[in-house]
Amino acid sequence: MPAPIRLRELIRTIRTARTQAEEREMIQKECAAIRSSFREEDNTYRCRNVAKLLYMHMLGYPAHFGQLECLKLIASQKFTDKRIGYLGAMLLLDERQDVHLLMTNCIKNDLNHSTQFVQGLALCTLGCMGSSEMCRDLAGEVEKLLKTSNSYLRKKAALCAVHVIRKVPELMEMFLPATKNLLNEKNHGVLHTSVVLLTEMCERSPDMPAHFRKLVPQLVRILKNLIMSGYSPEHDVSGISDPFLQVRILRLLRILGRNDDDSSEAMNDILAQVATNTETSKNVGNAILYETVLTIMDIKSESGLRVLAINILGRFLLNNDKNIRYVALTSLLKTVRTDHNTVQRHRSTIVDCLKDLDVSIKRRAMELSFALVNGNNIRGMMKELLYFLDSCEPEFKADCASGIFLAAEKYAPSKRWHIDTIMRVLTTAGSYVRDDAVPNLIQLITNSVEMHAYTVQRLYKAILGDYSQQPLVQVAAWCIGEYGDLLVSGQCEEEGPIQVTEDEVLDILESVLISNMSTSVTRGYALTAIMKLSTRFTCTVNRIKKVVSIYGSSIDVELQQRAVEYNALFKKYDHMRSALLERMPVMEKVTTNGPTEIVQTNGETEPAPLETKPPPSGPQPTSQANDLLDLLGGNDITPVIPTAPTSKPSSAGGELLDLLGDINLTGAPAAAPAPASVPQISQPPFLLDGLSSQPLFNDIAAGIPSITAYSKNGLKIEFTFERSNTNPSVTVITIQASNSTELDMTDFVFQAAVPKTFQLQLLSPSSSIVPAFNTGTITQVIKVLNPQKQQLRMRIKLTYNHKGSAMQDLAEVNNFPPQSWQ
């Protein structure tokens, strides 16, 4: 049989192929020749054939039929054969294939070989693709080589030990004695791999940092020698001595100094030297400075050192390299919580980054700008952010608008400024704002009694001839309906009043109704506004009746229903119309979970103002309750009665009260309800309907201890209890769900079931997102009727999304305190 072509000739031949089909034909032809050679057990050219096969594998062609030939080369006594055999094993084999176990004995023999290069090949292969079984069998040999005096073998053995620890963490203690002398080595390769091994051990075991903290002075000494040493051609990179080793040492110091005062004190001086002596003109120096900054911010460093670190990040923002600017912004986001005033010094540079062409830098700069907003700089920062909102790409507008809303709500210097700012956002990016922006602005306007005339005049001007920004039109329609009389009377004192007639106001609202840009929701706002004006205007009531009657036959079901109900008010209930359509009272602002929450971005955390989310408006789906009952099993479970989202009449009078309004958890008298502008809708009877709207709960709740009903995977559910004054059989349980992990839990749903002798109602939760780092809680109220005073038992089901996975769990709660049910 003729000798096969050499690898170099094969490469040259393949490169001459003009088409992919021609290349594929050459590969198939050569693979056929290699297979024939393998079948004939040709030992002479096996090494050459496997080398060609590896090249084909690199091109993406199948080469699995050469796996056993690699094992034969490994068993050969020739170094050239072993080299190709081990390379093939690393490329063609992995721990998912049982074939790799066949070479365990060969690797063991080669680890004890007399030639260091053969030992090095075996260490490289084991460190690259060794399975947990192989690591357990060969860990002893690796540990012996870790103690050898040969620096070539020690560095390879250290890296192999890293792989062994990753695969079999319980073998970590085997390598502890060998790590004692590793840092005494002069060879930089051994030092580098030793630091990698120590870092891996500290990250894998929480006990290791305390064991290795005694090495901090030695690490500091090595790092100082690297900084102070002169030019060394062997280790010099762009004028810096071995930057790779410096970075690794800084990372290890960061782990060892975390939460330890003594270690942090020992490394303060060297970190200051690195930060001041490192050259920043080259990217190598910037990499070392970045690691230094991370170490300073992570350990218990001095305040002056932290200021130095943040100033380094500030210099990074001026760098021409986009990657360095992005890294600086990300790092400042992490530090702004602890060093807010220091980061403020770089505010102008951060704001300039909003004008960067790179979208990633823009987003980081926007997030950091919102984190820097406070009561002192709110006007200037909002001016910059509104300019950014006006010119940024569409994908930024929603987040930017939400951030402006939240910052304005928290730090607004005056109500007029607050209203002007939100109206500017709605005018600029109204189509991108969140759904809760409209009700939040309406609530703000309602509560700013002295600004009603000014606001309705501004909104009237804003929508003249432009209905493209639907949220703005909705707010304007609501305000015109509420305060149309102030608009017509021209009572605005803040700016020059405008002369508007009743017909002109109705013309605007009718234009909104017939505009092609108006959504169904916007038309509903406009029709309701026109109806409200029937009690505020005097000369146009007949026109309003005509408009309302026209939409009684609208093809939009929602609009038709509104029009029919309003027509009934004009005809059958005209004596109630003025009372039902009177002006809305001041609304109470409900906030949850504190002023701030943690926003998660790319695995890092930064503070952002809390986004107050309204509770879900609809009832809990019946199918979810039924699914819960199916999973819980048994026939002694009573179903969950869902909460009705609409209001129901109170037994005390004709007011409309929400279900949640029936129960005042603070024990204070219930607030007077708002007059309704729609007819009352009857509700099915509920077990607690007979309770009056008087204060229901007494101070006995203070004596009922709370319990932890569930605690697993970072999610904690706590129950607190209250008892009714008017009906002792009613227990109200308030659940609080908190999340101690680093990522938010989304789409959170809590369900519960009780035995048939009880009745249970779940009210709507405060949110569907459980914030990370215990920065907020979800609250939900459960009402339980226990007429027979039996011991309370409950089964719960939890569903949520976390780290991209859907989670679900069931639990049983039997440890209710006796005071909650006796």
From Swiss-Prot:
Question: Which range is the signal sequence, renumbered to this chain?
Answer: none
Cysteine pairs forming cystine bridges in this chain are none
What's an example GO BP annotation here?
intracellular protein transport
Entry-linked InterPro entries? Adaptor_Complx_Large_Subunit, AP1_complex_gsu, ARM-like, ARM-type_fold, Clathrin/coatomer_adapt-like_N, Clathrin_a/b/g-adaptin_app_Ig, Clathrin_app_Ig-like_sf, GAE_dom
The record's subunit annotation is: Adaptor protein complex 1 (AP-1) is a heterotetramer composed of two large adaptins (gamma-type subunit AP1G1 and beta-type subunit AP1B1), a medium adaptin (mu-type subunit AP1M1 or AP1M2) and a small adaptin (sigma-type subunit AP1S1 or AP1S2 or AP1S3). Interacts (via GAE domain) with RABEP1. Interacts with EPS15. Interacts with SYNRG/gamma-synergin. Interacts (via GAE domain) with AP1AR (via coiled-coil domain). Interacts with CLN3 (via dileucine motif); this interaction facilitates lysosomal targeting.
Family per UniProt? Belongs to the adaptor complexes large subunit family.
Q: What does this protein do?
A: Subunit of clathrin-associated adaptor protein complex 1 that plays a role in protein sorting in the late-Golgi/trans-Golgi network (TGN) and/or endosomes. The AP complexes mediate both the recruitment of clathrin to membranes and the recognition of sorting signals within the cytosolic tails of transmembrane cargo molecules.
Protein name stated in the entry = AP-1 complex subunit gamma-1
Protein's organism: Pongo abelii (Sumatran orangutan)
